[in-house]
Amino acid sequence: MYEPDDKMISLIRDNYNLLQSLGSFGISLGFGDKTVKQVCEEQKVDTYTFLAVVNFTINGNSYLEDVSKLSVPTLLQYLRASHAYYIEFQLPFIRRELMDALDENDSLAKLIMKLYDEYARSVTTHMKYEERNVYPYVEALLEGKVAGSFEIDMYSKHHSQESTKLRELKSIIIKYLPSDGLHNNQLSATLYDIYNNEEWLALHAQVEDHIFIPAVRRLEQKSKQSDVTAKISNMISKNQEGTEALGEREKDVIVALVQGMTNKEIADHLCIAVNTVITHRRNIARKL
């Protein structure tokens, strides 16, 4: 587990794959011997969120001490930049590698390119769907807007660890690798890159499933609670004509009761004593 006081350069020495993640978080190199916390604060990246992603992708640690500490804007920046990296750089890069390693007149080479292009289209379509639908929905939640009937769980089951097209592609390359040295070496290197990118994509999907989606679920819950609070407050105000007015704290207690909280939970939520909650409830009963 990496901590805020660990040196950033130590993380990179332990796992050079972190270099791409740094770019997606918007962290530039040249940070000397500064700690993770120092680098994140200087480059305006949320430290807790950065370490949550790093500890998950490097150490496989999916335990989140406190989902409420996650910065959803930081996660959105990371995911968007990761998509741009994969669509604009990695997919075209591997395609060029395949083109250089294959004989364009060979029928098997044409099949390999066809399978790769289908895979690339599928991945791009999925990522563009997230860009057009999921991320704007999350931004609306951040702004306190209730965005229609869409919920994050509708999207959370869409990931698969490996595309069928990519599996077929790897199988063909492995089975029918050309015998001449140059093309064999080129295609072997490309196959290695394909495996690396497949692993990267699987980790990316897991970050969405285990870190991003729980953070968005919490946003949804807060949004629903705020909506309920507003409706109840409005209802209370309308029903108080000619009666003794309820205090703001008493209104808070009513909202908490409607949400199903116990006296103890209300006390913790409002930072007051349980006896105070009971007193408020008696006053509410008298006034209403």
Predicted regions and their residues:
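Helix-turn-helix DNA-binding segment
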Residues: 230-276
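Small-residue-biased structural context
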Residues: 1-233
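Short, Lys/Arg-enriched C-terminal cap helix and immediately downstream tail that follows
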Residues: 286-288
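Residues within the DNA-recognition helix of helix-turn-helix
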Residues: 280-283
